[in-house]
Amino acid sequence: MIEVLNLTKKIKKTTVLDNISYTFEKGTIYGLFGSNGSGKTMLLRALSGLIVPTEGSITIKGEQLHKDISFPKSVGLIIENMQLLPQYDAFTNLKILSKIKKIASDNDILDSISRVGLENFNSVKVSKFSLGMKQRLNIAQAIFEKPDILLLDEPTNAIDEKGVAFVHDILLQEKKRGATIIITSHHKEDIISLCDIALEMNHGRLETSEKVIYKKDS
């Protein structure tokens, strides 16, 4: 669970996150939609600990970010312009990350690669991957440690229809496992097709009126 209270982030004189308060529950898929510059990616960066709020707090599983912990534990993250290592193959990219985090076995890595449909490309250099394949590998990186929280910025961007089906299936499995999942998109329709709750970002504000929250029927 993630509890956000009066979260504000200012960059110079610009308010990029504006007094956001919301609780993201476990076992739920949340979708943030809104135009470019609305604050979607900035909110994910704040929730991941990559940026420090100007005001307010973020509490994850009882621990307050930047007070009790610097970075939340067990978070899978995809953000815009996330870098892969093009000189290495798919398996090695995840293996290097697992060594840095000191988590996950080779079997966990292979399973994650298979779940995103790249099992036949383990030994292929990432430099030869299409944009869609790179995005799927990013998703494999996000899920291979079985995180409690998934923060995914445009996870289906550049992915073909078959790849989108893979991603949706993966996220539904992660939801069943009890993960808190937050994804972003420019399109409300894309959010509604997958998410339990859709929330609109607008000029740094998280709109939570009934007009813009969609709750999927049980």
Swiss-Prot record:
InterPro entries xref list: AAA+_ATPase, ABC_transporter-like_ATP-bd, ABC_transporter-like_CS, P-loop_NTPase
Alphabetized GO MF terms: ATP binding; ATP hydrolysis activity
Ranges of residues in domain ABC transporter: 2-216
UniProt keyword terms in alphabetical order: ATP-binding, Nucleotide-binding, Transport
Binding-site residues, ATP: 34-41
Source species, domain of life: Bacteria
SMART domains in UniProt: AAA
Pfam families: ABC_tran
Chain ranges passing through the membrane: none
Coiled-coil regions listed: none
UniProt record similarity statement: Belongs to the ABC transporter superfamily.
Protein name in the entry: Uncharacterized ABC transporter ATP-binding protein YybJ
Organism ancestry: Bacteria, Bacillati, Bacillota, Bacilli, Bacillales
